[in-house]
């Protein structure tokens, strides 16, 4: 249960700060500026997972999975304290930049999380465990959207603001919720047991990573397994379309629907996560740990 709680809180903390920044952008900016800034926020969250998947995977193999999760959880405490400081000082650009730092922390944590699932459940229960942890993550995201959006609007009741700085100062107490959640996550991560020891013999090829050769090699390796390659392509299309919609819809709702309440906007966007929860649980119902590859084209049809 500690592992599930760690995954839940980690997703909620990542989403919580993003929601606050997105809602701030929604309240202050309009039209193309709002769409562009929202797209940048989404990009800052996704890019670390692309550029850091090689070193993140190395760290997950080099050190024990619980150690990586403990270190990531502790770093989240420091990051959320800095974010809270930015809220109180009204440092919008700094808080905006901390979105990237928080995403880097999550990108380094992610391989250890999924590797730990395999250690706990083994090959036989891998499919069901992956589906359950994915559903847990999405539920955390939905919960984070509701909690932080409601808190955001509540802190702005009867408050006046004219720019990002004044708005952030009003909602600054929300930062302490991020800090508290990070502390709880770290305490729970400290309870995780080491099932595998560190491996001292692994060395990361930094030179190949910097010049891009390692990335090319990893991408080429995807071609060796068509199922993995097509799954990666499908996920790329899904998240590409999803992030485009998430960036455009708030501006559309504000301009066309004349809706300025972020609880309604974020609530509508949160509905998209319900389908992901159902799909994750459905994908985890394979017998004997087998992954239902037949669901991949079904998912593609549903997306189209």
What feature does the model see in each segment?
Residues 1, 192-233:
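Juxtamembrane intracellular "pre-TM" segments in multi-pass secondary transporters
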Residues 2-19, 41-60, 64-77, 94-153, ...:
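Substrate-agnostic recognition of the 12-TM MFS/MFS-like secondary transporter fold
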Residues 20-29, 84-86, 141-178, 251, ...:
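Transmembrane alpha-helix termini and helix-breaking/packing motifs in multi-pass membrane transporters
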Residues 30, 34, 64-65, 91, ...:
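A helix-boundary/kink motif common to multi-pass secondary transporters
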Residues 31-46, 169-173, 254-273:
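Loop-to-transmembrane helix entry
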Residues 58, 88-92, 153, 157-161, ...:
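Transmembrane helix-loop junctions in multipass membrane proteins, especially transporters and channels
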Residues 77-84, 179-186, 304:
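Small-residue-rich packing faces within the transmembrane alpha-helices of Major Facilitator Superfamily
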Residues 115, 119, 167-206, 289-290:
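Helix-loop junctions on the cytosolic side of multi-pass membrane transporters
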